[in-house]
Curated annotation (Swiss-Prot):
GO terms assigned for molecular function: metal ion binding
SMART domains according to UniProt: JmjC
Stretches assigned to the JmjC domain: 96-256
Annotated gene: yxbC
Assigned keywords, A-Z: Iron, Metal-binding
Family: Belongs to the ROX family.
Amino-acid positions noted as binding Fe cation in the UniProt annotation, renumbered to this chain: 145, 147, 224
The protein's name: Uncharacterized protein YxbC
Entry-linked Gene3D superfamilies: 6.10.280.40, Cupin
Cofactor: Fe(2+)
Protein species of origin: Bacillus subtilis (strain 168)
Length: 330
């Protein structure tokens, strides 16, 4: 495999090279790269997230506050909600963790770097990506869960303790899951879930202490939790993880959408009389046959041509929501 041109990420994970990272770690094995925090200055726009004050000065969007302080305020209804940037510092002092989602909206240099990094990581062009800044104080953190995204975490201030545990229940998950939800599992996740979940404190986890200047590559699906008893600040670069299923479905949709029958309005099968149900079943069988024929003629080239599709409508919607809110003053 040909080597990848040296990059900002490569300079941070050194002595691991970008080629070694792609071959030995990406996309399933975590990597901890330690060094001085000054090396993060190679990240474009880093000076705008160097301190919590820097972040609050540029972030013109609602801030997610998370943790026990929120649970207490809401009388147990929720552990998180959105507040204005003006209120965020007050919640921070109460012990809530702050999440500045889509921080890259306010730092064009970071946005451009993320797009370049997406290409270096060989991700499809339509992959969702963003920067998130996390700030926590007085024991703030997140309980055990796994993500459907992958993260590059750059610890800027303070020390944060991470628990990392191999996921024996699912591989390549396509949705986020909080361990506190067990034994409830969403239908899609249930279809490929195996065994019993781990205990909530992840007793068999590896303990990783992130100190200023440490970078953690966190693959999707890895069980993890975080905790800090001091003020911490970290920059997360988050990438979606489009599966071959996503690309194939997008390519198949492009083939089928030209057929008017597939664009017809669907009906509620339960609302029909038996004779109509039988007639509809026959009609759907003909559509299934057409679908099968199109799937059989699907080519790798057609699949590759779908790489710029929108694989994450939720994140796309969130981005539009955040963009609209940037015009408001708090």
């Amino acid at each position: 495999m040909s080597a990848v041109t040296e990059s900002v990420l490569e300079s941070i994970i050194s002595p691991v090279t970008m080629s070694e990272f792609l071959e030995e770690y990406w996309p399933v094995k975590p990597l901890v790269a330690r060094g001085e925090v000054e090396r993060f200055t190679s990240i474009p726009g880093f000076e705008k997230v160097r301190t919590l004050e820097n972040v609050l000065a540029i972030y013109n969007n609602p801030v997610m506050v998370v943790g026990d302080a929120v649970i207490e305020e809401s009388e147990g209804i929720t552990d998180r909600f959105l507040v204005s940037p003006a209120e965020a510092l007050e919640w921070y002092e109460k012990g809530a963790a702050l999440e500045f989602d889509f921080t890259d909206l306010f730092i064009p240099q970071v946005r451009r770097w993320i797009e370049k990094l997406k290409a270096e990581l060989r991700l499809p062009a339509g992959t969702s990506s963003k920067a998130i800044v996390y700030a926590a104080k007085n024991g703030g953190g997140f309980k055990a869960h796994f993500d459907a995204y992958t993260n590059l975490i750059f610890q800027i201030q303070g020390e944060k303790t991470w628990k990392l545990a191999k996921n024996e229940n699912v591989s390549n998950p396509m949705q986020h899951y909080d361990l506190s939800e067990a034994p409830y599992y969403p239908d899609d996740l249930q279809s490929y879930w195996k065994g019993d979940p781990p205990k909530e404190d992840l007793p068999d986890a590896e303990i990783v202490n992130l100190t200023p200047g440490t970078m953690l590559y966190l693959p999707r699906g890895l069980w993890h939790s975080t905790k800090s008893d001091q003020a911490t600040l970290a920059l997360n670069i988050t990438f979606g993880q489009p599966a071959w299923l996503d690309l194939m479905l997008a390519a198949l949709r492009k083939k089928l959408i030209s057929d008017n029958r597939f664009r017809e309005l669907a009906v509620n099968h339960q609302s029909l009389h038996e004779s109509s149900k039988s007639e509809l079943n026959g009609y759907l069988e003909s559509l299934i046959q057409t679908l099968s024929e199109n799937a059989e003629t699907l080519t790798p080239e057609q699949i590759f041509q779908s790489q710029d599709s929108d694989f994450d409508p939720y994140q796309s919607t969130q981005l539009v929501f955040r963009q609209l809110l940037t015009s408001y003053k708090f």
